[in-house]
């Protein structure tokens, strides 16, 4: 965790985080879990275990990721992930909900004054998790579904039918064929079991010429005609942790799921940490460093850039990173770079 905190602090000092302010001074923090190891033969004491269809034991490791996101930026800023593993001496599997408690508590401890809006899917829209967020002074935009939040949807529809809710339609500013349709109700009970826990309900449809997309969220942010579009953008932005983060880590050259060596203790989790740390550094460079951006454009992809970097490290004597990036952009000039003949 200290390595992530050090890089994050450097980004703060460089005012990088100012680009990620989303709403009323708050930052969007997306949380989601993913698996990075599974096997029926290789295991360690910290593997979670489940039975396959044939009663064969399947061992696996997962992690919970947390990344700062913004609708207008492709790059994300990962925080230190939380491994989902069995602790020493434990017989029960760890789970995403417990990992979220640890990750959120660590995040608040390390960043006590960072204003955060947590964005998650419908699995997180439960009373214990929302109470955890409230205790840590974090706001939320959480997906909800009729199947798991029947009473909430019923109350929202009843309030709208009685004229106690609000509606708004607006044409998209960039594409007149698209209409944004909002319906919202404030101060509803989360469910029948937790009537004291009040939330605001937002129903949104994006109506286009070929299809209509439908989303629903709960939030504790104020819902008004001036805020619903922004909050919708924040809720839909959650996909960045799935696509821009986990998909990139698994399929775009970082090889998060590759078994570099499982070890007998925490080696698998350490490799996952190091992969996420490398991803953090790359994301910040892609967002802020003109030389890195030029080098990436010159080499067409991150894989191409990494291949060229490895080659230059093997054959060139480099004094600093600036020299490396100039070589990646313009080629190794004989007058500025010495070949390593040792």
Stretch-by-stretch model annotation:
Residues 25-36, 66, 100, 118-123, ...:
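Short, conserved catalytic/metal-binding motifs centered on acidic residues
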Residues 51-114:
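Electropositive, glycine- and tryptophan-enriched low-complexity nucleic-acid-binding patches
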Residues 90-149:
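Domain-level cores of phosphate- or acyl-group-handling catalytic modules
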Residues 225-260:
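Short amphipathic alpha-helical "interface-anchor" segments enriched in bulky aromatics
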């Amino acid at each position: 965790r200290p390595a992530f905190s050090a890089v994050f602090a450097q980004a703060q000092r460089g005012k990088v985080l100012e680009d990620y302010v989303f709403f009323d001074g708050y930052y969007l923090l997306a949380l989601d879990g993913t698996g990075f190891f599974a096997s029926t033969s290789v295991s360690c004491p910290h593997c979670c275990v489940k039975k396959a269809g044939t009663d064969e034991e399947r061992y696996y490791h997962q992690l919970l990721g947390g990344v700062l996101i913004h609708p207008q930026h492709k790059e994300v800023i990962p925080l230190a992930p939380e491994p989902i593993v069995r602790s020493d001496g434990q017989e029960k599997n760890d789970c995403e909900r417990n990992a979220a408690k640890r990750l959120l508590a660590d995040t608040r401890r390390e960043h006590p004054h960072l204003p955060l809006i947590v964005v998650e899917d419908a699995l997180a829209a439960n009373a214990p998790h929302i109470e955890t967020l409230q205790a840590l002074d974090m706001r939320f935009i959480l997906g909800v579904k009729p199947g798991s939040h029947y009473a909430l949807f019923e109350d929202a529809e009843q309030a709208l039918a009685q004229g106690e809710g609000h509606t708004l339609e607006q044409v998209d500013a960039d594409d007149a064929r698209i209409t944004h349709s909002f319906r919202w109700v404030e101060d509803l009970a989360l469910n029948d079991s937790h009537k004291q826990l009040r939330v605001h309900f937002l129903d949104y449809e994006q109506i286009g010429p070929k299809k209509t997309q439908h989303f629903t969220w709960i939030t504790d942010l104020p819902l008004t005609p001036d805020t619903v579009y922004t909050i919708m953008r924040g809720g839909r932005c959650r996909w960045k942790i799935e696509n821009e983060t986990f998909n990139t880590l698994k399929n775009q050259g970082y090889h998060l799921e590759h078994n570099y060596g499982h070890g007998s203790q925490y080696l698998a989790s350490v490799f996952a940490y190091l992969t996420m740390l490398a991803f953090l550094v790359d994301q910040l460079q892609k967002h802020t460093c003109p030389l890195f951006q030029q080098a990436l454009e010159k080499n067409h992809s991150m894989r191409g850039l990494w291949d060229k970097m490895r080659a230059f490290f093997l054959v060139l004597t480099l004094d600093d990173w600036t020299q490396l990036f100039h070589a990646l952009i313009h080629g190794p000039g004989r007058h500025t770079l010495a070949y390593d003949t040792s």
